[in-house]
């Protein structure tokens, strides 16, 4: 079986990766970046096959956009690898050190997790981001992308693995599962002892499948039913700009807004302005009964709309009585990703920050900033929506764990 063979190679490579010096890792990342640029034509030809097949199957435009590569996106992947090379290596850091009364020095040292399995869908850039971040954090990585992007992923992964190996990275540190059979994923999720952690990136069904079926520990990522609450005191121009950015800039990503909640006190004045602007960008509005009464041209929202991550130019809109109803709605329907309030009321802003139980909570800013690069972490491997180990954008530190190191001078326990 392909996945078992590659997992064994990865496990062997991970032991060597754990003690690799920072200079070697950084040199490999730079060479990997250069290799992507030098082989851009090869990547684009492979990607063209995937895009043509996606269009033949009539996939949504937003999904084709996530799949599609061009020279600009390849350059961005290369820049991401170079940025990771410039980041501080967390491996070996002593985070805390204390001395016990008996003279023992006890410290917490950052160490690699080991072998990380990535299961993801359409975006080929994840192949480069995941390989680079796992490498810098001293981990081996097994990549399993979606069948939609198989040609692109094979091209990118082979280029990266070859460049890394030539730079002194152990063979088997970067591997792609080329078999698109779902049984390979099922086997991958059961490889306890060979794979230390699985990180799924994709839609609801993929993440749900991994969480429910993996016996290997999982970090839940991604699904983003994100909300923006426009409070009664909000600056209308600011609110409009934030909502348009959060919905229109890249609707097919997990930090795009899916539901806007509007305070009843401003609904009649604000909604027509917002709907007009969004409609000019091709956004379909699905509104509650009161929204539809104020803006008759919008579609009627159903219960399902409040719980849907559209990943498309569709937005659910609901008028709420006050901040209490907004918080209640978010608590019921949020996936714990990113939520924002637009307000000039300090008390409401602070209450929103404290009350909303999501990985990223904003005041007067777009949810689109929930991103490793925007947070200053460099490329991210995913956005965790769980509370254990990692939460929010996962950078280098989140791809390590720690161990206790104890320095003694002959102490024995009495």
From Swiss-Prot:
GO terms for cellular component: cytoplasm. Disulfide bonds: none annotated. Its EC number is 1.2.1.41. Its main location: cytoplasm. Transmembrane segments: none annotated. Gene3D superfamilies: Aldehyde Dehydrogenase, Chain A, domain 1 (3.40.605.10), Aldehyde Dehydrogenase, Chain A, domain 2 (3.40.309.10). Pathway: Amino-acid biosynthesis; L-proline biosynthesis; L-glutamate 5-semialdehyde from L-glutamate: step 2/2. It catalyses: L-glutamate 5-semialdehyde + phosphate + NADP(+) = L-glutamyl 5-phosphate + NADPH + H(+). It is found in: Cytoplasm. It is an enzyme of class 1 (oxidoreductase). Belongs to the gamma-glutamyl phosphate reductase family. Catalyzes the NADPH-dependent reduction of L-glutamate 5-phosphate into L-glutamate 5-semialdehyde and phosphate. The product spontaneously undergoes cyclization to form 1-pyrroline-5-carboxylate. This is Gamma-glutamyl phosphate reductase. The lineage of its organism: Bacteria, Bacillati, Bacillota, Clostridia, Thermoanaerobacterales.
């Amino acid at each position: 079986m392909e996945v078992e063979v590659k997992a064994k190679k990865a496990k062997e490579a991970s032991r060597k990766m754990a003690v690799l010096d920072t200079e070697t890792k950084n040199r490999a990342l730079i060479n990997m970046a250069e290799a992507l640029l030098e082989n851009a034509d090869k990547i684009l030809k492979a990607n063209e096959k995937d895009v043509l097949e996606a269009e033949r199957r009539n996939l949504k435009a937003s999904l084709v956009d996530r799949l599609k590569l061009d020279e600009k996106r390849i350059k961005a992947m290369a820049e991401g690898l170079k940025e990771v090379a410039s980041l501080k290596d967390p491996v070996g850091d002593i985070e805390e050190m204390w001395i016990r009364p008996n003279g023992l020095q006890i410290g917490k040292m950052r160490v690699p997790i080991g072998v990380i399995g990535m299961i993801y869908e359409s975006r080929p850039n994840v192949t480069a981001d995941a390989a680079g971040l796992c490498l810098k954090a001293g981990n081996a990585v097994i990549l399993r992308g979606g069948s939609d992007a198989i040609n692109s992923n094979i091209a990118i992964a082979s280029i990266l693995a070859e460049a890394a190996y030539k730079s002194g990275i152990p063979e088997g540190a970067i591997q792609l599962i080329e078999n698109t059979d779902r049984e390979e994923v099922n086997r991958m999720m059961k490889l306890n002892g060979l794979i230390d952690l699985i990180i799924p990136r994709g839609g609801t069904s993929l993440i749900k499948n991994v969480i429910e079926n993996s016996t290997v520990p999982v970090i839940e990522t991604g699904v983003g039913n994100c909300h923006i609450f426009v409070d009664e005191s909000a600056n209308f121009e600011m609110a409009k700009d934030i909502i348009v950015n959060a919905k229109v800039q890249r609707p097919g990503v997990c930090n795009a807004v899916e539901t806007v909640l509007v305070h009843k006190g401003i609904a009649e004045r604000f909604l027509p302005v917002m709907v007009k602007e969004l409609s000019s960008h091709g956004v379909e509005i699905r509104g509650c009964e009161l929204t539809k009464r104020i803006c008759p041209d919008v579609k009627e929202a159903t219960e399902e709309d409040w719980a849907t991550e559209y990943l498309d130019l569709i937005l659910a809109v609901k008028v709420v009585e006050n901040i209490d109803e907004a918080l209640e709605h978010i608590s019921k329907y949020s996936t714990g990703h990113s939520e924002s309030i637009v307000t000039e009321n300090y008390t409401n802003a602070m209450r929103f920050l404290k009350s909303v139980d999501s990985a990223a909570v904003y005041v007067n800013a777009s949810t689109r900033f929930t991103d490793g690069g925007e947070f200053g972490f460099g490329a991210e491997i995913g956005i965790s929506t769980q509370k254990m180990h990692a939460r929010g954008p996962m950078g280098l530190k989140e791809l390590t764990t720690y161990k206790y190191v104890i320095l003694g001078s002959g102490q024995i326990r009495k």
